[in-house]
Amino acid sequence: MIKVAILGKPNVGKSSLFNRILRERDAIVSEKAGTTRDIKKREVSLDDDLEEIVLLDTGGLEERDELFNKVKEKALEVAKEADLVLYMVDGKTIPDEEEIKYFRNLQKLGKHIILVVNKIDNDKMMEKVYDFYELGADEIFPISVSHNRGVGKLIERIKKFVPKKPKTFEVSEFEQEIPLEDLLVAEENEENLEELKEIKVAIVGRVNVGKSSLLNALVGEERAIVSDVDGTTIDPIDENIYHDGWNITFVDTAGIRRRSKIKDIEKYALLRTEKVLEEADIAILVIDAKEGIVELDEKIGGLIDKHKNGVIIVANKWDENAEEFHKFRKEVYYRFKYLYFAPFLAVSAKTGRNIDKLKDEIIRVYKNYSKRIPTATLNKWIEEATIRHHLPTDIGGKEVKIFYATQYKTKPPTIALIMNRNKLHFSYRRYLVNFLRKKEDFEGTPIIFVARKKGEKHEEA
């Protein structure tokens, strides 16, 4: 699989081109220089007949401070790994010494480089392109990402570097044909198997609690750029690892600031965090063990509760003794009452303490999150629960009955109670949830009950 890297100074349109190729708004795009600070990696198919490519969007190459020096180093490292480099420039400006210097350094790597001159919005601006010939590029493509001008030609050029998919045999080439229904069953079973082995994990928390450091520790290499600057990571960075037979995808989300401090790009990041939680199976809520729990931590926990993710609470930067751990653990469950079912783990991304244990915990919580209870077993437990603690009567004093129960969804486990009423008092629902937790390992996952009167659609109890 070939790698195509997009490089250039901040605000020349790298993320916009990245998104155009992906055909979706994935990277956060802003007029603020240096919006994309981390290396983003996506696999994309440019044509059905071609193999997929790995598209890499790098941070802007501008030498201003320590953070951007790190970004620059990362971008150049990516260029070394890439098979094709798209070096983007702003067609509305002229190349300066710094830009020429970067381009010369890239040429020394011996990579095939396409110079992409962006913001050439019309034919009159084509003369601007000639200013960039002094860079000595082998190929120059004038484009306008915002006007979708010339992008198609650029993609066609990229395709020339992509190998074709290996030829596949037609069914007729086999001596024995396989019945269509068998193929469909096999495909369905394969999809189910893949689903059972895929976990999507969102790493969430407020700014500078160590989410990027935790991601790097989990993945085993420095993918997210780490800095003491608040909000260093803006875009989510997807990284996959294989652990104990499972494919785990980590998404390192932008830190959430207090609302009074949210401006411009942080608003995008907040929305992206919500989006990631919607798509994720498991949320890792990262809190700073040294700073302790603040109100914003609780609000972020509320987002997890809202989206009904499986959850693990992680205290990062932990270096205290066992006695302090138990005190802090008690405070965690006091402040996060609505996440009382979440396991709590103290880790150190810096030293690697409990990182492997966290990986194991992700798998365990996901198994609970996707668990299905056999109907016979579930009804046995519900019957036992109602015998131990009778159902409350309704407002009119009439008896409330549960005829039977069935789990109709997983992720999270969702159970329908078929009743003579379509509502169940919240206190009894809580009792049933706690009863089930004693019978089965549901740590890390919410359990949802819906009350359904015979003949009616599901409604949340």
Swiss-Prot record:
PANTHER family: GTPASE DER (PTHR43834:SF6). Residues 371-455 form the KH-like domain. Residues 2-166, 199-370 form the EngA-type G domain. Pfam families: KH_dom-like, MMR_HSR1. The gene is der. This is GTPase Der. HAMAP family: GTPase_Der. GTPase that plays an essential role in the late steps of ribosome biogenesis. Belongs to the TRAFAC class TrmE-Era-EngA-EngB-Septin-like GTPase superfamily. EngA (Der) GTPase family. GO terms for biological process: ribosome biogenesis. GTP 1 binds at residues 8-15, 57-61, 118-121.
